[in-house]
From Swiss-Prot:
Residues 445-460 have a biased composition (Basic and acidic residues). Keywords: Metal-binding, Nucleus, Zinc, Zinc-finger. The gene is Pnma3. It comes from the Eukaryota. PROSITE patterns: ZF_CCHC (PS50158). It is found in: Nucleus, Nucleolus. Residues 384-399 have a biased composition (Basic residues). PANTHER family: PARANEOPLASTIC ANTIGEN, PARANEOPLASTIC ANTIGEN MA3. Expressed in the cerebrum and cerebellum. This is Paraneoplastic antigen Ma3 homolog. GO terms for molecular function: nucleic acid binding; zinc ion binding. The keyword 4Fe-4S does not apply. Belongs to the PNMA family.
Length: 466
C-alpha cells in the first residue's frame, strides 16, 4: 500500500511524515533534469523541498521518489497527480489529523449535497424535536446517510489515532526527540486512552521507537513474541530511566536544600517527593517519618528565628507535625509576610529603586550581612566560641576581664541597606530611594570599626603569664 510505504520510508530516514510525500509512477527512462523540472512546476506553491531518495517498484515497473518539504503544507493544496513523462504521477501524502480538516471536508460534502447540519441531525435522529421513531426517512435520504457514513468513518479513525512521540535512547540529543521521563509519561497516558487490542498498541509503540530503544524491544520480542506493552515500557525504563537505588535516594533527600528564590512551602513539597522515593527504596525508616522530615527542613530551609524555635521545640518534644500541617504552617507564614510587604510596597510605589544586589562590588559583598529578621534567621558569630574559651581561661588563671568598653559589651550587628543606607533591612527588600552618600559613610564607619572587641585583642595582645 503506498501510504504504508511512505510511513516505512520516513521511519527509516527519521523524517516527519506530515512534511513528506511519495511520488509514484515515474518511468525509468525519465532523466533527473526532466524529473526535477516537472516536480518544480507542480510543487513550487508549497515552498522549498528536497529529494531524499528513489527506489524501483516491481509491481508498477516504475520508480518511486521520496520528497521532504521544508515546512508544513496545506493538505488541500497538494496535487493528487502530476502530469509528467509516461503519464500522470501519483502523489501520496499522509492525511492530517486535525479537527479543522475534518470539519472542512464535512462542510464541503454538505455544500455539494446542498444540505445543512440540521438536515443531518434530522436524518440521523439526533435533533431534540424529532424522535427517530417518528421520522420517516426517504430512500434518497437513506442513500445520502450511507454515503455520509462512508465518508466520515475513515476520517473519524484518523482523528482518534495520534502518533506517539519519537524516542531513540541515544545519549546525544537529537532535535525533535524527548527525554525518557517525558516520553514515558506521554506514552503511558496515550496507551491508556486507546481502546484498541494489545497487538495494535504494541505496533504503535514500535512505530515511535528508534535506534537503541528499538533494538531493546526487538530483542524482547525475539525472546517472547507475546510480550505486552506494559512489559516493554518497564524494560525501557530499566534501560534508559534514571538510576535511583537505595543509596542515591538517601543522598538526594539528605542533601536537599532550599534553592534561591524558592518558597519554604515549595521546598517542603519538593522534599516530600524525595522522602517518598527514599521510603520506597527502604533508605529511610518509616517509624519516625515526621521526625525525619522536620529534621531535614530545619537543616535545609531558611526560616525566621521565631519559626525555627517553634519547630525545634516540637522536635525536642517528639511531636513533629505531618506533611500537610507543615505546608499549611509555612503558607500561612508566607501569606502573612506577603500581606505585610504588600502594604509597605504600596506606600513606596513610583519611587526609584537602587541597583540590584548582583551589581554590588566585592568590597560591599564582604559587609553584606543578610539579617532581615522576618525572612532570614540571625546566625551566631563564629568567633563567639573562641571568646568564650578565652574568658574561661582567664578566670582559671585569675585574670581580670576587661571593662565593658573593650570586650564584655553586648554583641550587636550593624546591618544596613546598600541601596538607601537605612538600618533594619537589606537591599533585596528595599523600596526606598537610593542614597549612595549615606551608604558610603556607613561603609567607611564599619571598616574603621573593624571586628570590634576581638580586633582590639589581636592588635593589643596581653603578655603571657609565667
Amino acid at each position: 500500500m503506498p501510504l504504508n510505504l511512505l510511513q516505512d520510508w520516513c521511519r527509516g530516514e527519521h523524517l516527519n511524515t506530515q512534511r513528506s510525500m511519495l511520488i509514484l509512477g515515474i518511468p525509468e527512462d525519465c532523466s533527473e533534469d526532466e524529473f526535477e523540472e516537472t516536480l518544480h512546476e507542480a510543487l513550487k506553491h508549497l515552498g522549498r523541498y528536497r529529494i531524499i531518495g528513489r527506489m524501483f517498484r516491481r509491481e508498477e515497473n516504475a520508480q518511486a521518489f521520496l520528497v521532504e518539504l521544508a515546512r508544513d503544507f496545506d493538505y488541500a493544496l497538494v496535487p493528487r497527480e502530476i502530469e509528467g513523462k509516461g503519464g500522470p504521477w501519483e502523489v501520496v501524502v499522509k492525511p492530517p489529523h486535525s479537527d479543522d480538516e475534518f470539519l472542512n471536508r464535512l462542510n464541503h460534502f454538505l455544500e455539494e449535497e446542498r444540505r445543512t447540519v440540521s438536515d443531518m441531525n434530522r436524518v440521523l435522529g439526533t435533533h431534540s424535536n424529532h424522535s427517530p421513531t417518528k421520522t420517516t426517512i426517504s430512500a434518497d435520504f437513506w442513500v445520502w446517510a450511507q454515503t455520509l457514513g462512508a465518508v466520515m468513518q475513515p476520517l473519524l479513525e484518523q482523528m482518534l489515532y495520534r502518533e506517539l512521540r519519537v524516542f531513540s535512547g541515544n545519549t546525544i540529543s537529537i532535535p525533535g526527540l524527548l527525554a525518557f521521563d517525558s516520553w514515558l509519561e506521554h506514552t503511558t497516558e496515550m496507551l491508556q486512552m486507546w481502546q484498541v487490542p494489545e497487538v495494535e498498541k504494541r505496533r504503535r509503540l514500535m512505530e515511535c521507537l528508534r535506534g537503541p530503544a528499538l533494538q531493546v524491544v526487538n530483542v524482547l520480542r525475539a525472546n517472547n513474541a507475546a510480550i505486552t506493552v506494559k512489559e516493554c515500557l518497564e524494560a525501557l525504563r530499566q534501560v534508559f530511566g534514571s538510576v535511583d537505588n537505595r543509596k542515591i535516594a538517601q543522598l538526594k533527600f539528605c542533601k536537599a536544600y532550599q534553592e534561591p528564590g524558592e518558597k519554604v512551602s515549595s521546598f517542603v513539597v519538593r522534599l516530600e517527593t524525595l522522602l517518598q522515593k527514599a521510603l520506597e527504596k527502604n533508605a529511610i525508616s518509616r517509624k519516625n517519618v515526621n521526625q525525619t522530615r522536620l529534621k531535614r527542613i530545619l537543616g535545609g530551609a531558611i526560616l525566621s528565628a521565631k519559626l525555627r524555635e517553634k519547630l525545634k521545640m516540637l522536635k525536642q518534644r517528639r511531636r513533629p507535625p505531618g506533611f500537610l500541617a507543615l505546608v499549611k504552617l509555612f503558607r500561612e507564614e508566607e501569606e502573612e509576610w506577603e500581606a505585610t510587604r504588600g502594604s509597605e510596597r504600596s506606600c513606596y510605589e513610583g519611587l526609584e529603586l537602587g541597583p540590584s544586589p548582583s551589581n554590588i562590588g566585592s568590597e560591599e559583598r564582604e559587609l553584606f550581612v543578610p539579617a532581615f529578621g522576618s525572612v532570614l534567621e540571625e546566625r551566631p558569630y563564629q568567633g563567639s566560641r573562641r571568646r568564650r574559651h578565652r574568658r574561661r581561661g582567664q578566670h582559671r588563671k585569675g585574670g581580670v576581664p576587661r571593662d565593658d568598653s573593650q570586650g564584655t559589651r553586648k554583641q550587636n550587628y550593624d546591618t544596613f541597606c546598600y541601596s538607601c543606607g537605612e538600618d533594619g533591612h537589606i537591599r533585596v527588600h528595599c523600596f526606598n530611594p537610593s542614597n549612595r552618600t549615606l551608604v558610603k559613610q556607613k561603609r567607611q564607619a564599619a571598616m574603621e570599626k573593624g571586628n570590634r572587641s576581638w580586633a582590639w585583642e589581636k592588635s593589643h595582645p596581653k603578655p603571657k603569664t609565667k
